[in-house]
Amino acid sequence: MSDYVIIGAGGHAGVILDLLIARRENVLFLTDADPARHGSQLRGVSVTGSDDRLTGLDPTTVNIALGIGASGTDLPARLTTRRAIADDLRNRGYRLPSLIHPAATVSDGAVLDDGAQVMAGAIVQTGARIGHDVVVNTRAAVDHDCDIGDGAQIAPGATLGGNVQVGCDVWIGLGASVIQGVSIGNGAVIAAGAVVIDDIPAGARVAGVPAKDIH
């Protein structure tokens, strides 16, 4: 059992809290930038204030779990901001271990970088690399030899075939499918339900079956 503090107290933080409880970790408290959440609780764990509550904690004994998700407009910018928060915490000496829900399936031949989060029901196959601060969400599937760039998020139910290359800060939406061997550039957004059969350039926004640019 390890001690954790969760940064954020919204919906994604609740999922991370469930993950840590399932792993029988000890969650000390949550922080949040929104004062309206201070003094509230999630599953009996207190939201005690903003990130300044970390002051005085020993970063060699307390781990950090990033409970900040991404939603709404300008998703790549939100993902970049999320990754910057994680990098700032690391620069201050805190550890953000990779987290795997006990109900996820992750091959021993896969590599998870610090801060990666794999949720319940997700599958990560052999040879895959999951970058720093990536979220592989509920029931998402990442097949063999994929490479997922730092900060990317793979939404619930999305499926990636083998050898897919995903850049940094990419959003792959709910239930999207990406066929084998495709490359997706940094900051691209794949809409929910899209079927990607061709390479996607950096910064593109695509939707549909097959996926087409919607700029």
Language-model segments: residues:
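Hydrophobic, well-ordered beta-alpha structural blocks that scaffold small-molecule cofactor pockets
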Residues: M1-D58
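Cofactor-binding loop segments of dinucleotide-utilizing enzymes, especially the Rossmann-like FAD-
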Residues: A9, D32-A33, G69, H101, ...
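Short alpha-helical
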Residues: G11-H12, T80, V111, V195
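Short glycine-/acidic-enriched loop or helix-start segments at secondary-structure transitions
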Residues: I16-L17, L75-A77, I200
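Active-site phosphate/pyrophosphate- and oxyanion-stabilizing loops and adjacent acidic/basic residues
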Residues: D18, D87, A194
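Conserved acidic residues
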Residues: L28, V62-N63, C168
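Phosphate-bearing ligand-interacting subdomains
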Residues: H38-H101
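Structural signal for interior beta-strand "rungs" in well-ordered beta-sheet cores
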Residues: S98-I214
